[in-house]
UniProtKB/Swiss-Prot annotation:
It comes from Nitratidesulfovibrio vulgaris (strain DSM 19637 / Miyazaki F). Signal peptide: none annotated. Synthesizes alpha-1,4-glucan chains using ADP-glucose. It catalyses: [(1->4)-alpha-D-glucosyl](n) + ADP-alpha-D-glucose = [(1->4)-alpha-D-glucosyl](n+1) + ADP + H(+). One of its GO terms (biological process) is glycogen biosynthetic process. This is Glycogen synthase. PANTHER family: ALPHA AMYLASE DOMAIN-CONTAINING PROTEIN (PTHR45825:SF11), GRANULE-BOUND STARCH SYNTHASE 1, CHLOROPLASTIC/AMYLOPLASTIC (PTHR45825). Pfam families: Glyco_trans_1_4, Glyco_transf_5. Keywords: Glycogen biosynthesis, Glycosyltransferase, Transferase.
């Protein structure tokens, strides 16, 4: 049996998703699988997952997770997902909840215990299956202990001796930081509790565990890999990242064009592509249908419509957008906001919708189908993030011919060619400032109004950009090759 790359993740679309992590892990392993890499995924069995939906079945009953003081077990379910095995760790007391990590009261009190258990269960499952993986690929703090377990266990257990690990940081701001007393129950040896290990200002830091002990560390864009080495974006972990800099790689995420592609999008009233003989008539029909669906003024069909999709939190810069709405309304544009998050931002967005009814629509929440229609029906996509490790929605916007206006940070810098370059695919501004954001939007609006041919050329260039997972997969193949495994 060929040894596998095994992804360990707390989310994987379509089985679970709270944001970009779910999207990425729904696409990346599958892309590698289709490139010939033996690949599987281990993820929790959350309460909302229905076994009948994807042919999920019980494959291992009472898998012993390996706490020496407590014979705790879990059940392992399995699904064949497009020819790739996905394993689900099931233990109701930890994962049978309405939400993944928190509810309206805040983070779940036992998150540390939950994801210690998940990481140990993943390792126990692999031991039970009997074939050591080639690469264990962990993602964010929820699986950060996996590289740490591997680091220490392969020193004494021949089963793990030739396995290597990768830790991918999708967002450094979320670290899994917990009280020091919880380290005692995690199963790592005392020597892991150091400044160069899992200890962080007296706390137990699960993401730091992965960074400290993985053989390779990746982030989701080259620019973000550079940014997190300094205090502005390092979130307190710039020290350990500088120590591990030789092992740190920035690999741009991909977009799943099997799902996000206007030429085959099942959620759109009209499909279209960059080379359609009717030009962008299909996109214009999508715009008219979206205005009707959301109760916006029909005359906006002849004015720029600006779309925002994202969490209504400071990181995404929603406050910058809300600050400048009155100025945007002076330019007779439409604005659509889709997302949820900070209650104050939600309330403010809804208040603005009342003030500018017919020209601004705010939908608190998220539905996948509406997100697709907003991408297709908007003329300009807004992404004023204060930081952005990679970002996926701007990649989707490019494919849908909706030039973005975005902050020049992280993956936004790596994916958008800014106007006025002759190869421009969008517009960027230098820092999180409402006036700079407004000026960039007004540049885009002016261009839309006064240079139809140039705007359509920009749309066409945007739609032809290749941010596929096949492209990203080649970079991961090279990374695995550096670890000693050639899957080509």
């Amino acid at each position: 049996m060929r040894r596998e790359v095994v992804f360990v993740t707390s989310e994987m679309y379509p089985f679970s998703k709270s944001g970009g992590l779910g999207d990425v892990l729904g696409a990346q392993p599958l892309a590698l699988h289709r490139m010939g890499v033996p690949t599987s995924v281990i993820t929790p069995f959350y309460g909302r997952l229905r076994t009948a939906d994807y042919g999920i079945h019980l494959t291992v009953s009472d898998c012993h997770v390996g706490y020496p003081w407590d014979p705790i077990t879990c059940d392992i379910y399995e699904a064949d997902y497009h020819g790739m095995k996905v394993y689900f760790v099931h233990r109701g007391e930890y994962f049978d909840r309405r939400y993944y990590y928190n509810d309206h009261k805040g983070d779940y009190f036992d998150n540390c215990e939950r994801f210690i258990f998940f990481c140990r269960a993943a390792m126990a499952l692999l031991r039970r299956l009997g074939t050591p993986p080639a690469v264990l690929h962990a993602n964010d703090w929820q699986s950060g202990l996996v590289p740490a377990y591997l680091h220490f266990w392969r020193q004494t257990d021949p089963f793990w001796a030739d396995t290597r690990s990768v830790m991918t940081i999708h967002n450094l701001a979320f670290q899994g930081r917990f009280a020091s007393r919880l380290f005692t129950g995690c199963g790592l040896p005392p020597q892991a509790w150091t400044m160069s290990g899992v200890e962080f200002w007296g706390d137990f830091n699960l993401l730091k565990a992965g960074i400290a002990y993985a053989d390779m560390v990746t982030t989701v864009s080259p620019s973000y890999a550079r940014e997190i080495l300094g205090p502005a974006y390092g979130c307190g972990l710039e020290g350990i990242l500088q120590v591990r800099q030789h092992a740190l790689h920035g690999i741009l995420n991909g977009a799943d064009y099997g799902i996000w592609n206007p030429a085959q999008d099942k959620f759109l009233p009209c499909r279209y592509g960059p080379d359609d003989p009717q030009g962008f008539a299909g996109k214009q029909r999508c715009k008219a249908a979206l205005l009707d669906e959301l109760g916006l003024a029909p005359e906006l069909a002849h004015r720029p419509v600006l779309g925002f999709i994202g969490r209504l939190r400071g990181q995404k810069g929603i406050d910058l957008l809300l600050d400048i709405v009155p100025r945007l309304m002076e330019r007779n544009v439409g604005v659509i906001i889709l997302g949820e998050g900070n209650l104050a931002h939600e309330a403010r967005a809804l208040d603005l919708m009342e003030t500018y009814r017919g020209r601004l629509c705010a939908i608190v929440g998220y539905t996948e189908d509406l997100a697709h229609r907003i991408q297709a029906g908007s003329d300009i996509f807004l992404m004023p993030s204060r930081y952005e490790p990679c970002g996926l929605t701007q990649m989707y916007a490019l494919r849908y011919g909706t030039p973005p206006v975005a902050t020049a940070v992280g993956g936004l810098r790596d994916t958008i060619v800014p106007w006025p370059s002759p190869e421009a695919t969008g517009f960027t501004f230098g820092r999180s400032d409402p006036q700079l954001f407004l000026e960039a939007i007004l540049d885009a609006v002016h261009y839309w109004e006064h240079d139809t041919e140039g705007w359509r050329a920009m749309m066409t260039r945007a739609m032809h950009q290749d941010f596929s997972w096949e492209r990203a997969g080649r970079s991961y193949l090279n990374l695995y090759r550096q670890l000693g495994f050639d899957f080509s």
